[in-house]
Amino acid sequence: MRDVPKSLGLSVTTPGGSSGAPDSGRHNSLEEINLDQFLKTSNYEDTVKQLDIYYGIVKRQLLRYQSPITGLFPVMSTDQVVGSVRDSVYCASAVWSLYQAYRRIDDDRGKSYELGQSTVKCMRGILECWVKQASRVELFKQRQSNQHALHSKFQLHTGEKIYPDEFYNHLQIDCVSLYLLFLVQMITSGLQIIYTHDEVAFVQNLVYYVERAYRTPDFGMWERGSKYNNGTPEIHASSIGMAKSALEAINGCNLFGEKGASWSVVYVDIDAHNRNRSIFETMLPRESSSKGVDASLLLTLSFPAFASHEDRLVEQTKQNVVNRLRCKMGFKRFTRDGFLSKNEDKSRRYYHSGELKEFEGLECEWPLFFIAMIIDGVFKNNNEQIEEFQNDLRRCLRTDVNGDPVVTMYYAPDGDGSYMRAPSQSLFLWGQSFFIIAQLLTAGLLHINELDPIRRYLPSYNRPRRAGRYSAFQGTATDLVVQIVLIAESMRLQAMMATYGIQTQTPHEVEPVQIWSSTELIKVYQHLGVNNKVGLSGRPCRPVGSLGTSKVYRICGMTVLCYPLIFEVSDFYLYRDMALLIDDIKTELQFVGKYWRLSGRPTVCLLIREEHMRDPQFKEMLDLLAMLKKGYCDGMKVRIGRLQNLISSSCIEHLDFMNQSDLTDNENAFSQINHEYIGYQSLTDVPKALTYVEEKISVAHFDTKPTPDIINALRSTDSIYCLCQLWGIILNREGPHFEVNGLNVNTALTQLYHRAGSLRYWRAVRYCSSLLHHIVDSISPFITTVLVNGKELTVGIIGQKETVFDKPMTPAEIQNVMYTSVQPYDVIQAVLQQEVVLYCGRLIATNPSMFRGILKIRIGWVLEAMRIYLQISGQQSIDVDNLSPFQVRILLQKVLTVSEWAVEEKLTTLQRRQLEGCLCRVPKHFYNKIWEILQRTPQGILTQGHHLPATPTLTNMSRGELTFNLLVEETLICIDRPERRQITVELLCIVATILNRNPELHFKQALDLDGILAEAFAMYCKDNNIQHQPKPEHEQTKNEDLKAFYSLPYSETTGYLARAAVNKVLQGGIFSTNEEDVQLDGDRLHDDNCKVS
């Protein structure tokens, strides 16, 4: 019989053999050590003998099933048809880990070379399969959808596609990311995997493929999307984490290894990396909207990805997984996972609605995750964890006919305490691969630095710096200073600034350095990854963000500094608001300082244009620059200096992929305005732009008049807003190319837009902007930020159908929604709601507490809250439509923080209920309370004619699940008056408290909230001698004015509502103490809590 390899604390008994004794050698330390010294702890011959045993296991259990043609591996050893990319990468990693272990041996008799080349064959086989699908990569860069996704399954021996898109969920971002991650690890170890420039270009395009993981709903590691298995993809934290790790690993990597050239280096968009990082850490400890906890996060937070080094967050997430998914024979993948369980109908691809309930308590248990925890313990040098999970793993091991240890794929509980084991004749290759890696580590044959040559397990600031001159992640500097260069548009502006002690430079003074807009940099990056042979176009036209514009670039001998997006003169009107620009500059500097992760200091270019100094608020800009000059911006260290003096300490990115022939003359570089005389000496000499004021006049009566009458009206009116409306009527009737006096409608509106903008007449600016179908720049990432914080967005006019943003959308899709569902009902709101969406995205990223208790941010209702606040504060004459963008942002912050200032500003209870009701804000644990009410109310809850049923709600969903919370929120939003909506929330909390304190009580009938409110109001009227005529039950309080009741203090309404609820008990036995009358939900332990905060 075969000898059994020794490992740390794990013994495997073979037929006729003895148990492997625990190895007393040290457990792998995280510190750098001399590997030769490490070897001395074991006898050389014994090491060779053990490695040879593992070589035999790898040959028999892995390489035996590798396709000799493509190099791919199947999922199960008995499968001769389907090769799986993810499983192939993990198999290759096990083979490679043994290759790494053999490299210590002087004479391995060719085994090391064979193992290394087998690894290369697999990785190149995957690459070749994907290169055949290069057209998909090209399409996916433009639109991230399943029909354009790279396939994750191929024909095992030919590498051809095997499952059409409509029959398999190929969109798995984590799969491509995993490949890139191990590609870098293996190249770093010395393997030559990438051979040609064509392949370099393709890998660069794979980077573009995964860059937008943060906004790409996919089907995840388990290939099924949402836990409901209904074909719906969703955003997965595990996919985003894998992508984040892959981007970090491959940034600046030379794919040709030590023999590489400048054109074989891979570049990563640092802003895309940062979005993936921030959204990934925001989602934790959740996996997705439907899965509150998932075992895939173990592989993301530990080996192989090590996607986060926020210790507290990582430990919280791991403990969440261990506590809720760990079982006797393995980990569940997630709760109510029906895959391979005894109740799953294998003949159907998708589940029926409500079917998940049948899988509760019958989820398969996967020993694979015991091994993952063992490997995690080795990296953390946690011997207790290693031993604990090795003991668990022993129960799941068996031996094959060769005496080799085999890890069972899964155990399926049968409901009575026993298990059905996976078929024994087939090996689960992913599990075997992990087992081999764990054994090599715990036996002391493989060091963690050999398994992880790029040191992913260490925080970025502790990793060895990659050789070369390309940017590298280094972690957060403790003494980070944001460098600032002030560029004045002209010499007279420079002279005027000097009068106030602000030293600036003109574009001429910084020469030969050029000042570019980020759009010019986008054009340069479009050359990165271009390959006509494969059909790849390079980097898509994605904006360069704040971090990207904080680098200094070297391009074909030129030095270039880019100014941030906030200084771009775009179609959308926000750039015209000086107060908003000042606030954005502060936000920009804070953002760069907080999220900078590269070596070298960030250098931010601030532009000062002549039109800025004509703005009435330019003095505030001078105050900001004076503050920056002192070296601080809201606690962030900054340094203003001459560009030539700051370059040496900047982060410099060498864009060596550019050829001189590809570089066109940059006519759009920021240029200096020259004047014959310097002129202005101070602000008092500068002519100011006037703030335009005119009466709001409606021209609705022209809707029915003929076009010639409207044209005559155009000639006779001086009102800008009237002109906007009249041109809008002509646009709707005649189209954008209709001409009036040689001027087409589009051109006339554009001219009017700029005229209104220069006058800061915001109502007219917004009206024209909407007619021109403008869209806010880079709005998509802000919507995604809202979504990953566990919220949803809706846009639309109150009283009309709303459109829900529940998944990331492209700018074109957003534009279509705004101008089809909003503009037909209110022209200005089509752009005003875009503004509010943008501000919500920014605020939730920096101040998530502002949105606590709000599950769905309904933009139409948020604007209604703003209008109510203006009325409350005595500013009825002010129209939200005519506020400046900065004022809109401040007003938004005001209504979102009502609880902080309500007492100080002496809000009445009614006013507070109106504001909170518009936002549909609920108290902590509110949705869990509704779940408990439904458990005791078989007939459900009724309000305003809307029914929230207990069945199938309780069977289809689980407590705390985002889908359930949204269903409850939909019920509340059916209540049309915000103050009534809020008092209904209070009533539900009171009912929940009554049920909680009286566990024997259950509702026999539907819980009629309108009826209880009517009863409470009647009590109030009686107590206060108010004449009140009760209405028929079907009309009860539907439209009744309860303003006096809504205005009562919280303590008084609580008393009336509680009395009314108790009265219902006394009046007709609506409560039952007989538990048999109530079909209770058994879901006590199943609690996928999604934070609604």
Swiss-Prot record:
GO terms for biological process: glycogen metabolic process; positive regulation of glycogen catabolic process. Residues 1-27 are annotated as: Disordered. It is a lipid-anchor. It holds the Pfam family Glyco_hydro_15. One of its GO terms (molecular function) is calmodulin binding. Although the final Cys may be farnesylated, the terminal tripeptide is probably not removed, and the C-terminus is not methylated. One of its GO terms (cellular component) is plasma membrane. Pathway: Glycan biosynthesis; glycogen metabolism. A lipid is attached at residue 1090 (S-farnesyl cysteine). Residues 6-27, 751-778, 905-936 are annotated as: Calmodulin-binding. The keyword Membrane applies. Keywords: Calmodulin-binding, Carbohydrate metabolism, Cell membrane, Glycogen metabolism, Lipoprotein, Membrane, Prenylation. It is found in: Cell membrane. Belongs to the phosphorylase b kinase regulatory chain family. Phosphorylase b kinase catalyzes the phosphorylation of serine in certain substrates, including troponin I. The beta chain acts as a regulatory unit and modulates the activity of the holoenzyme in response to phosphorylation. This is Probable phosphorylase b kinase regulatory subunit beta.
